[in-house]
Amino acid sequence: MITSREELDAIKKSCRAMVMKSSGLSAGAAVIPVPGVDIGSDVTLLMRLIPKINEKFGLTPEQIEGLDTESKVMVLTAISNVGSKMAGKYITRKLVLSLLQKMGVKVATKGVSKFVPFVGSAVAGGISFTAMRYMGNSHIDDCYRIALETLENREAAMATSTSSSSQTANEGFVPKDAEPPIKDL
């Protein structure tokens, strides 16, 4: 479980580097003028990338299931608040394909542009790089917001429990130099 904002920022930076690498691989596959190679490689890349990002942020289904009840509720509430489609879920081919279909215009443009000699492959590679980077970074941003909300809620819960327990400990405490209470006659 992430314990500080510094740790969270380091995870985000590490995940951004993974996304850049995957985006480069996606662009490389898109340059190959064979229909379907780019989509197949994008699906494979995303099916590896998204679970790695989830794991780094502590948001795989197994990691969430291993949390205590209170922490699990905090994480699931944060996922719901952010509206993430991939955090805390098993990443399937069907899920990845549906996300790629939502980017359908970019994918279709990439497919058509491939068949324009020389320039078309470069355009397809650029579109593929941009689409992969967008999807990866969007997921990182979602995971970051989920983890940050969970961290802030956990800190607030700890502060509340600490202040209420110190209040309870101080009840009935009267300093030596305090004046005795005035009694009604």
What does each of the following model-derived ranges do?
Residues 1-29, 43-185:
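Terminal, membrane-proximal amphipathic helices
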Residues 39:
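Solvent-exposed beta-hairpin/edge-strand motifs
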